[in-house]
A protein has these predicted regions:
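Active/binding-pocket-proximal capping segment
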Residues: 162-168
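Cysteine-centered iron-sulfur cluster-binding motifs in ferredoxin-type domains/subunits
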Residues: 142-161
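Iron-sulfur-associated redox domains of electron-transfer enzymes in respiratory
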Residues: 1-134, 138-141, 159
């Protein structure tokens, strides 16, 4: 899968953990996920409502990718994250060359700039952080459960969630 954003790759990792769960395992889904080569694009322009920092999903990944590309205009800087990524680079040596030290410095500078621009105060980010830290009172969950239509819409909004009934 080429070009998925950091948040998408993180969502895929959450789904992989779900489908390899304690009480349910979907071998077909797991085989497809694990056979994929995850080539992500580092995010230079997170949106105002993005919440990838709340689930360690970016804007640039440190894990969960095989190859991660950073767009430097006329060239791409590639980080290798796994053995599968290293094998892909080795299989196409004409497409890759070692990064110059200046490119590594540029990547660090850009990452700091992107991190500084990130909207950490978005209501989605604040809510996600409260949920992940266990700061939502049980009464609130009970209230939401009463209103829940079991449509799964929340799962379409956030791939880190898997709050649905699995029937086969």
């Amino acid at each position: 899968v080429f070009g998925m954003r950091s948040c998408d790759a993180t969502g895929l990792a959450f789904l992989e953990r779900f489908f390899a769960g304690r009480s349910f395992e979907d071998d077909s889904v797991l085989a497809r996920i694990r056979a994929s080569l995850r080539m992500t694009m580092a995010c230079d322009h997170p949106g105002p409502d993005c919440f990838c920092v709340c689930c360690d999903g970016g804007p640039w990944l440190t894990e969960g990718f095989d190859l991660q590309f950073a767009d430097f205009g006329s060239r791409l800087l590639v980080d290798v994250g796994t053995g599968k990524g290293a094998a892909a680079v080795a299989a196409a040596p004409m497409l890759f060359q070692a990064a110059e030290p200046e490119a590594i410095e540029e990547r660090a500078r850009r990452l700091a700039e992107v991190d500084a621009r990130f909207e950490r105060r978005s209501y989605v980010a604040a809510g996600t952080k409260r949920i992940s830290l266990g700061q939502v009172p049980i009464e609130k969950w009970e209230q939401w459960a009463e209103d829940c239509q079991c449509c799964g819409g929340c799962c379409f909004v956030c791939p880190t969630c898997s709050c649905f009934t699995v029937n086969d």
